[in-house]
């Protein structure tokens, strides 16, 4: 898979959907909206547009200073799946800070990982693309980030 390239772009040249996606993320981070549906309604953005851009558009300051990222996974319940996931995260140079796994129900489990990316040897999107290739990972997304 091709490595992702990032660009620094002035806000006034971004399409409306991307600017509004950033507004929705800000509302959710600051608890000014109770849900994604509430936030997109406040900024007049479709939910599909928000989900299209939410993992692709970030304020510049977050790309510079963020070192802790929380990831959410939906996994098939297989022996060794969590171990393989954690090994891939460790191989990227990330440090696992916390792990939360639900009890598997109907062959599926949810896992939330908080990782430190300060020593990471690749960017978070490259790691996410590698993780998506595991056949036992049904879903991976960034839940949040912080310093």
Curated annotation (Swiss-Prot):
One Pfam family from the record: ACT
PROSITE patterns for this protein: ACT (PS51671)
The ACT domain, residue ranges: 70-145
Top-level taxon in the UniProt lineage: Bacteria
InterPro entries: ACT-like_dom_sf, ACT_dom, UPF0735_ACT_dom-cont
HAMAP family: UPF0735
Family, per entry: Belongs to the UPF0735 family.
Protein name (record): UPF0735 ACT domain-containing protein RBAM_024960
């Amino acid at each position: 898979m091709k490595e992702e390239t990032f660009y620094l772009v002035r806000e006034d040249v971004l399409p409306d959907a991307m600017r509004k996606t950033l507004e929705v993320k800000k509302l959710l981070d600051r608890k000014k909206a109770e849900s994604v549906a509430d936030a997109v309604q406040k900024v007049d953005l479709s939910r599909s547009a928000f989900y299209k851009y939410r993992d692709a558009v970030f304020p510049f300051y977050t790309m510079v200073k963020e070192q802790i990222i929380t990831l959410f996974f939906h996994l098939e319940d297989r022996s060794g799946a969590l171990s393989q996931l954690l090994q891939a995260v460790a191989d990227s140079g990330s440090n696992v800070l916390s792990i939360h796994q639900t009890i598997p129900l109907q062959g599926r489990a949810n896992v939330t990982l908080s990782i430190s990316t300060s020593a990471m040897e690749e960017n978070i999107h490259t790691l996410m693309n590698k993780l998506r290739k595991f056949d036992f990972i049904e879903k991976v997304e960034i839940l949040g980030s912080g310093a």
